[in-house]
Amino acid sequence: MQTYVALLYSIILGEGRRVVMADLKAMAEGLGLKNPRTLVATGNLVFETKATDIVKLEQRLEVAFEKTFGRHVDIIVRRADDWLTLAAGNPFPAESAATPDQVAVRVMRKPVPAEAAATLQAYVGKDEKMQAVGGDIWIVFSRATPSSRLIAATSHKRLGIGTSRNWNTVRRLAEMFGG
């Protein structure tokens, strides 16, 4: 059995409705996924299943999500060992220790090309930092300027399918995998 994490892009279903994590777990169980569990109510699902193709697993989850909740949501899946590598690759450990809610990673379905990551530097604010690691985008956001230009610059339209998680979530998911 292989352990995976599924990251939902959004848990907002519209009209003030949100995905209930118990319903998300039930959906996973209905797919035959073992030991499904969630971390915080922001769309982080950890589970076990036989080793399988990530793209096919993402597609299965997305189809089941739309059938269960009536809305398509992009879902990015990573193997536990890949998540541990992502967490260990955090290029901003000092900032993560000081302000973990201000450090985030944009986890990408497909690695961001180096040239696309380089163009993001133009959007980095005075008190911000950005670095691409392993095809994902790490950002240190400024507390002084809460409306970062990087948020729009890292959108699906510009970089492809991805979803962001702050350092607290990254770390806690890694701990769920024994990291």
Where are these regions (language model features)?
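Surface-exposed, charge/polar-rich loops and edge strands
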Residues: 2-179
